[in-house]
Structures are given as C-alpha cells and as structure tokens.
Amino acid sequence: MTIKLINIGFGNIISANRMISIVSPESAPIKRMIQDARDRGMLIDATYGRRTRAVVVMDSDHIILSAVQPETVAHRLSVKEEIMDEGQG
C-alpha cells in the first residue's frame, strides 16, 4: 500500500489513506463534533486564522479544520489518484 498525501491548504499535508470524510462545517452536528474534538484535544486547526470551509474526519478520531473548500480537497484527491493510476498502467 502506497502512502497518498493531499494538500489541505497553506502547505499543510495529510495522509489521504487515513481520511474518512470531508464535510462542510455549517451544520449543527458537525459544529458539535468540532467542539467535542476540541474538548478531547483531538482537533487540528490548519486554517491559519481564516474561515473554516472544510472539516476532515480521520480514522484516528482526529478532526482537521481547513480553509479550503471540501470540493477542492476532494478534487485534489481524485486528481492524485488519476495520476497514480496512469503511472501503474
């Protein structure tokens, strides 16, 4: 298994293999999930003080806040997978 890394903005890179989901921070359940992670010390804020636009849920129970749109993160992931597939063929 190869390690896939993905840029979530401002030079911050996470392991794509360990991502569970990328969601918008607007809904009340996601806001509660962010607050719970903050209380447990499992929140990683990668926004550099900017507005949170994407919430990345990791398999380690960490929650990562990003200032990049969820669609942008997903697009970067899909482009990365396409490049990897072309390299194997």
UniProtKB/Swiss-Prot annotation:
<keyword id="KW-0238">DNA-binding</keyword>
<keyword id="KW-0805">Transcription regulation</keyword>
<dbReference type="InterPro" id="IPR007169">
    <property type="entry name" value="RemA-like"/>
</dbReference>
<dbReference type="GO" id="GO:0003677">
    <property type="term" value="F:DNA binding"/>
</dbReference>
<dbReference type="Pfam" id="PF04025">
    <property type="entry name" value="RemA-like"/>
</dbReference>
<keyword id="KW-0804">Transcription</keyword>
<protein>
    <recommendedName>
        <fullName>Extracellular matrix regulatory protein A</fullName>
    </recommendedName>
</protein>
<comment type="similarity">
    <text>Belongs to the RemA family.</text>
</comment>
<comment type="function">
    <text>Regulates the biosynthesis of the extracellular matrix and the biofilm formation. Activates the transcription of the matrix biosynthesis operons eps and tapA-sipW-tasA. Also activates expression of the opuA operon, involved in osmoprotection. Acts by binding specifically to the promoter region of the target genes. Acts in parallel to the pathway that governs SinR derepression. Required for endosporulation.</text>
</comment>
